């Protein structure tokens, strides 16, 4: 007589297969390899409760966590990218845009508008890396420029939260023009003696970092964000030299004065409000 019996393999006693678990219910943290429930991440502003690793946040999540509840008003939602170059590849530019619009619920890689932060009126633009690596095309550049110009006209601060792989190759020179356009709008905002707070998140690179992301009166970054122009691999292959430890991280750049302060995501809202009040009556 068998001492041990195999568990039943059929009927109602069958174990739930791994494939029956909803996709995305759990996330493995790249920082500590712990498995974290999606609900726990949402409640913790997408910060790992074990090691404080900062997962990517959507533009909508960032606005909800920073601005006063119900105060955000979106601007320029009708702007759409066009395939002026008729770009051809493994997929057309139009097809790629449609794919990311469906997966993110966004029209393009930035969400812009205005609202209040601890009662302070602000204009805001937030990049979303989930949309084509938050590359900057003509719509992204135009929406950011209009957000800046709205802030200047209303004499309120502008906050830009960056995360980007750089200029959008599908739009060629039109994407590169946005670097000058956004920078020009910020120069006029500065001439009006109005505050601009730039927040760098992981990753902020290339044309975005070389333009508006690095022009803030106050530049903050989330911990361990990758920040730079070209990637470390490209630089190493070009220079044939080993790079310093921590090269192109927020901590490395803070030590050298490019970043004013590294701020944990859960402390961003009060820290931004503190800086805006410090920067003078125009921010109040």
Regions found by a protein language model. Name each.
Residues 26, 45:
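Residues immediately within or flanking Cys/His clusters that coordinate Zn2+
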Residues 1-17:
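N-terminal alpha-helical interaction blocks
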Residues 165-283:
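Conserved catalytic cores of soluble enzyme domains
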Residues 29-32, 48-51:
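Short cysteine-rich clusters marking metal-coordination/redox-active sites
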Residues 109-190, 197:
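Cleft-lining beta-strand/loop regions that shape enzyme active-site pockets
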Residues 35-36, 54-55:
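Cys/His-rich microdomains that often coordinate metals
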Residues 11-16, 27-28, 55-112:
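An N-cap/entry alpha-helix motif that binds or orients negatively charged groups
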């Amino acid at each position: 007589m068998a001492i041990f019996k195999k568990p039943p393999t059929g009927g109602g006693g069958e174990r739930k297969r791994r494939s029956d678990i909803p996709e995305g219910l759990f996330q493995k943290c790249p920082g500590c390899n712990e498995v974290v429930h999606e609900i726990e991440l949402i409640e913790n502003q997408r910060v790992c409760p074990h090691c404080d690793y900062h997962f990517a946040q959507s533009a909508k999540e960032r606005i909800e966590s920073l601005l006063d509840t119900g105060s955000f008003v979106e601007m320029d939602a009708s702007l759409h990218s066009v395939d002026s170059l008729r770009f051809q590849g493994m997929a057309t530019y139009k097809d790629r845009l449609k794919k990311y619009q469906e997966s993110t619920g966004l029209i393009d890689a930035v969400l812009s508008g205005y609202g209040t932060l601890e009662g302070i009126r602000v204009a805001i633009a937030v990049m979303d890396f989930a949309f084509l690596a938050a590359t900057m095309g003509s719509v992204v550049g135009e929406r950011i420029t209009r957000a800046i110009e709205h802030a200047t006209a209303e004499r309120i601060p502008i906050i830009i939260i960056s995360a980007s792989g750089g200029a959008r190759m599908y739009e060629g020179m039109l994407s590169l023009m946005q670097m000058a356009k956004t920078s020009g709008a910020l120069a006029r905002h500065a001439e009006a003696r109005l505050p601009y707070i730039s927040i760098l998140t992981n990753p902020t690179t290339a044309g975005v970092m070389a333009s508006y992301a690095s022009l803030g009166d106050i530049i903050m970054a989330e911990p361990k964000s990758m920040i730079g122009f070209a990637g470390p691999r490209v630089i190493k292959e070009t220079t044939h030299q080993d790079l310093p430890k921590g090269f192109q991280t927020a901590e490395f750049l803070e030590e050298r004065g490019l970043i004013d302060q590294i701020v944990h995501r859960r402390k961003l809202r009060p820290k931004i409000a503190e800086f805006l009040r410090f920067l003078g009556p125009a921010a109040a």
